[in-house]
């Protein structure tokens, strides 16, 4: 199937005369050793799209935010249909996923699910020039998160120097996330690994992306062989008895009338996770590993989508290829 990409027209803008950019270039020159001539070349022609999307704060971030009826159905639909592609991806890169799972203790299906949600297994990595987008977000229109995006721009330039790549050629999402794992530059710098041992950490390389995701989860507290979440029973159709979301935790013995639907291999405090469907609320327990997934994206719905997609991928894989 032919895939046609219609890109927004780009105009080249000179940022070198902006006061804040001049200060930024001086910082990069004196603190990090970048050449003045090189910096001026990069900032002289910043490609700017007239149709680039505004960066909005996610509505599903945090643990205690209220959702609307049916919000889980709408949110999950776009991701849970990717199980077939996930089982194929897991089969194709089985040896690499197995090696990452053994080294970091993260199940193969969870690594695969994150790649599936973040980039649809590499198909949707983003087609924006990351340097240009971060420059725009850092220095235009008094963006409320300008300071954050400047730290990302610094990280991008430093990692491009370390990996010996041209920062002007790196493509990613409209907010600067890169590769199959959709790491922002600071995350890339902190958690990317050279999993194929070629001397480079490349997020557009499948092997490095797989290893880096597993490494990220491990460093954020993933516990091997510990269950992530389980569906629970409760009385009624809508649950409002207690605060829900990953930021609230409870001892299970204090949650009267709430029972797991199946065995849950986790003994610590749990979160109550409410998924608002059209006609009722699904309620789940979430353990420490569920919380770890929210470190990748601070949304209970995101982490639950990862968990449920991982389980669907595991079942699809067993059906198509047999058990691992």
Task: Enumerate the language-model features and the residues they cover.
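Extracytoplasmic ligand-binding site segments that recognize negatively charged/polar headgroups
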Residues: 172-186
């Amino acid at each position: 199937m032919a895939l046609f990409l219609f890109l927004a027209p780009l105009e080249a803008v000179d940022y070198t005369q902006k006061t804040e950019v001049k200060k930024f270039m001086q910082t990069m020159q004196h603190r990090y050793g970048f050449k003045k001539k090189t910096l001026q070349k990069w900032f002289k022609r910043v490609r700017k799209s007239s149709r680039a999307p505004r960066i909005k704060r996610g509505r599903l971030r945090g643990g205690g935010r209220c959702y609307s009826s049916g919000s889980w159905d709408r949110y999950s639909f776009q991701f849970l249909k990717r199980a077939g592609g996930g089982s194929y991806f897991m089969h194709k890169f089985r040896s690499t996923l197995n090696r990452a799972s053994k080294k970091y203790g993260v199940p193969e299906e969870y690594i695969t699910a994150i790649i599936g949600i973040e980039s649809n297994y590499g198909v949707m990595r983003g087609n924006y020039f990351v340097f240009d987008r971060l420059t725009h977000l850092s220095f235009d229109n008094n963006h409320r998160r300008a300071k954050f995006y400047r730290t990302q721009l610094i990280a991008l330039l430093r990692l491009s120097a370390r990996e010996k790549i041209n920062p002007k050629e790196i493509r990613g999402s409209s907010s600067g996330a890169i590769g199959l794992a959709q790491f922002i530059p600071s995350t890339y710098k902190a958690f990317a690994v050279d999993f194929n041992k070629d001397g480079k950490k490349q997020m557009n390389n499948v092997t490095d992306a797989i290893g880096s995701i597993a490494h990220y989860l491990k460093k954020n507290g993933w516990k091997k062989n510990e269950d992530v979440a389980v569906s629970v029973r409760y009385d009624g159709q809508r649950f409002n008895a207690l605060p829900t979301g990953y930021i609230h935790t409870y001892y299970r013995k204090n949650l009267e009338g709430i029972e797991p639907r199946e065995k849950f291999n986790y003994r610590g405090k749990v979160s109550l996770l409410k998924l608002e469907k059209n006609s009722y609320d699904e309620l789940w327990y979430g353990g420490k590993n569920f919380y770890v997934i929210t470190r990748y994206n601070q949304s209970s719905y995101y982490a639950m989508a990862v968990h449920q997609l991982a389980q669907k991928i595991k079942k699809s894989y067993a059906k198509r290829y047999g058990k691992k």
